Amino acid sequence: MDFELEPTLEELIKQDTLKWIFVGGKGGVGKTTTSSSIAVQLALQHPEDEFLLISTDPAHNLSDAFCQKFGKDARKVEGLSNLSCMEIDPEAAMSDLQQQAQQYNNDPNDPLKSMMNDMTGSIPGIDEALSFMEVLKHIKNQKVTESDTKDKVSYRTIIFDTAPTGHTLRFLQLPTTLQKLLGKFQQLSGKLGPMMSMLGGGAQGQQDMFAKLNEVQKNVEEVNEQFTNPDLTTFVCVCISEFLSLYETERMIQELMSYKMDVNSIVVNQLLFADDDENPCKRCVARWKMQKKYLDQMAELYEDYHLVKMPLLGSEIRGVDNLKRFSQFLIKPYDPKVDRAIITDLKEQ
């Protein structure tokens, strides 16, 4: 390349058009800290706009990161009035789905109802599907263009703190999968309806279900268009400087590219920067040597990506104040000679 991209997320933070930012990677690499830091910086840099951070990871950590309890409904972050958080609960969504299915009719022998109950209880990846349907609600109500109706919520950007790689890839594959599945289901609906009636299924319940499926299909098509538009959606990969994490990051990037999703930023967490320690321990020096080896490989492999290097901290990053201090290194490269005091002097929560 003729130029080197800035090793920061400053361009992403300042971009005006982004509506959806996904943050993902291998388990234990600091996804929640990174997604929370991105959300905090967005809120700080754009105080006049509203932002929403959503956790789609069944093992929710947003409440721990902000030292504040969040649930399935968006709640304002204390200390940042223009940032809200929520944690999607697949079990609660499953319960709501089953209750909605029961509303169609109360006949326990209805084969359609029995089929729906079996499906919701046994489909592989149902957690991701239910999480996706919850996300659909917010995307449907998100104002994307100025011509959108005024009753839509005008979040400037929604940030997703995703589950570990495998769950996330299944989650992101759902728009395409559902689009194909619903299309085939619609083709069968003309034949399926009379067949269900012959088996004793309620006609009104079937009509309601097919109407609901048509609505879902339209929403899924809209999401597919937005998720593959680089002006509206991007994915930030998070990793640590080790072989397994690097390998999984490359696998994820290849998958994301196959989904036609934009990805041009990688955050590398937990770096020691031992070269600048006055009295480094032998273990730290050895580990930093290993980290530098994989950093060099990343620099060569991802020369056309924003490669952001984040330091290992002396304590956990919890609470808004600590997130503000840590997140500044997403937009300004960390300098161990100048910034070491910032990362070793975090407030205990």
Curated annotation (Swiss-Prot):
One GO CC annotation: GET complex
Binding site for Zn(2+): C281, C284
Active-site annotation: D57
GO MF term set: ATP binding; ATP hydrolysis activity; metal ion binding
Subcellular location per the Swiss-Prot or TrEMBL entry: Cytoplasm; Endoplasmic reticulum; Golgi apparatus
Pfam families: ArsA_ATPase (PF02374)
Classification via Gene3D superfamilies: P-loop containing nucleotide triphosphate hydrolases (3.40.50.300)
InterPro entries: Anion-transp_ATPase-like_dom, ATPase_ArsA/GET3, ATPase_ArsA/GET3_euk, P-loop_NTPase
EC primary class: hydrolase
Main localization (coarse): cytoplasm
EC number: 3.6.-.-
Keyword terms, alphabetized: ATP-binding, Cytoplasm, Endoplasmic reticulum, Golgi apparatus, Hydrolase, Metal-binding, Nucleotide-binding, Transport, Zinc
Coiled-coil blocks: none
Positions annotated to bind ATP: K26, G27, G28, V29, G30, K31, T32, T33, E242, N269
GO biological process, one term: tail-anchored membrane protein insertion into ER membrane
Job of this protein: ATPase required for the post-translational delivery of tail-anchored (TA) proteins to the endoplasmic reticulum. Recognizes and selectively binds the transmembrane domain of TA proteins in the cytosol. This complex then targets to the endoplasmic reticulum by membrane-bound receptors GET1 and GET2, where the tail-anchored protein is released for insertion. This process is regulated by ATP binding and hydrolysis. ATP binding drives the homodimer towards the closed dimer state, facilitating recognition of newly synthesized TA membrane proteins. ATP hydrolysis is required for insertion.
Family per record: Belongs to the arsA ATPase family.
Subunit structure: Homodimer. Component of the Golgi to ER traffic (GET) complex, which is composed of GET1, GET2 and GET3. Within the complex, GET1 and GET2 form a heterotetramer which is stabilized by phosphatidylinositol binding and which binds to the GET3 homodimer. Interacts with the chloride channel protein GEF1.
HAMAP family with a match to the protein in the record: Asna1_Get3
Protein name in the entry: ATPase GET3
Source organism (scientific name): Candida tropicalis (strain ATCC MYA-3404 / T1) (Yeast)
